[in-house]
Amino acid sequence: MKIHLLDPHTYSMVFGWYLCEMARKLKNGAEISHVIREFEKQMDCMEIVLGPYSLKQMKKSGRISAAAAVMGELMGIRPIITLIDGKTKVEAKVRGDDKVVPAMVELCQKRAGDVEDFEYMIGHTNIPQAADLEKACRKAFGKPPLAVFELGGVVSANTGPDTVALTYTGHPREGKNIRQRAAAK
């Protein structure tokens, strides 16, 4: 038995669907080397946008300071965070829960607006805003998500139990695949 290690440098919410697709292709007779290249090519394009509705867990996990969490909660500030190639970045800050979903969809459209084979998935921590995100995405992208699923403990440990996520096909990054970027670090 040969074992192939694949590290997409992201949460399982992104690569789980594509691992299942790989398994289907292999079961139907595809060559492993072709399937791995296809997987890496797909992962080189995937991006995540997270929308936490509270700063409490982000403070606990050390992502933000206690002072920033208190002030942010008092002012109703909600960060819009991307996770790309294992790096998190606050892309925007919106004021009020009702602005989280529109900001996430807008950021996705900005980053992936002209991607030819655009696909997306929605993750959530079983909160009502998940339905709002799905509805907004269907309207903005003109098609349903590949999947809608509950976020796991790793995401929740970092962003909290009240988070929605949008993962989508963006543009290929840096002209290098995952392995080349990891080796360069």
Please place each PLM-identified region on the residue numbering.
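Mixed-charge interfacial surface used for oligomerization/domain docking
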Residues: 1-4, 10-185
